[in-house]
Amino acid sequence: TALTELRCENNQLTSLDVSKNTALTELRCENNQLTSLNVSGAAALTDLICYNNQLTSLDLSTNTLLDHLRGWSNQLTSLDVSNNTALTELFCSVNQLTSLDVSNNTALTELFCSGNQLTSLDVSANTDLTNLHCGSNQLTSLDVSSNTALNYLYCYSNQLTSLDVSSNTNLERLWCYE
């Protein structure tokens, strides 16, 4: 269809299928009760805002143009963004993620993954990161030496024993309390 923008936020939707909406570039479906979201055929999608739902999985493998993903406060147990190389903003806080691979997402400037169950996080390939929120996880180490553009680093409530920010000369805010 010719539909390019769909806003259906703040309802009580439990499922949404936009797989036939090939021209869709923006989907806002936040604040619903979604347990199923099919965006597989929406290859033009650049903005997906689906936070505060009940999603346990999200297949983004065909959404290679995706630039912004805001999917916090769901029940995601895994999130594969390896094909989403255009991502600049990834917000996946307050889910149930135990791992997150952002090595292919070299355009990322903002990564919010707080409130998950991450035991490790490799951001060495994300050299454009300016904003990293990874608090309230189970990280035992965090290497931000490659992230020289970082302005904000929130890594509180983890299990870090050391943190080297000597390369992060642009850092304006650092929260690493327990």
Positions of the model-derived regions?
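Leucine-biased recognition of intrinsically disordered, low-complexity hydrophobic segments
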Residues: L3-L6, L13, L34, L55, ...
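Conserved hydrophobic beta-strand positions in leucine-rich repeat
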Residues: L6-C8, T25-C29, T46-C50, D67-G71, ...
